[in-house]
Amino acid sequence: ETILPVDMMPRSTNEVPSLAMVMVIDHSGSMSSAGDPVSGATNLDLAITAADRAVEELTENDYVGVVTFDDRYDWQLPITKVEDKDEIHKAIESVAEGGGTTIKPALSAALNEIVKCDADIKHVILLTDGQGEDRNYGSIIQSYVDSGVTLSTVAVGADSDQSLLQTIARGCSGRYYYCDNGTDMPKIFA
């Protein structure tokens, strides 16, 4: 006889929760700086490489989206089921350098869409040098906390605002990564 609205049957130990991930990639002018002096890769090149590596960790049960931003944001790839990784890589690799830096609207856009996604885990990854706008992210952080969406940051380049990006990641229950060369590129999901 059922007493509580709880299923007490154990789930399969092989069941993996679905993931919705939106990568928010900075393509502002400051991202054209040399990020890796050895290889000559720019900060944008490093961000694209990190995003590509994150895609490789996704499964067909997952969802992915890509938002790019400079002084405005654009959906490079609307949130979609991971079916063709080559198409996802093409969308990421087609990101070109742009203008100024306005991070907050891109983070808000990512949050507004990811909350609509039917996935068990919802996670946003911000790939940026953090340069360009004010440092008051309290309302953005609170929006992420209220929605239950986690946000990790990847500080790209030696001139990145590491303190700001650590604060954002910590406030949104995410992880912080630092990357200044292609060799030590963080594997965001391992």
Model-identified regions with their sequence ranges:
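Exposed acidic/Ser/Thr-rich ligand/metal-binding surfaces
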Residues: 2-190
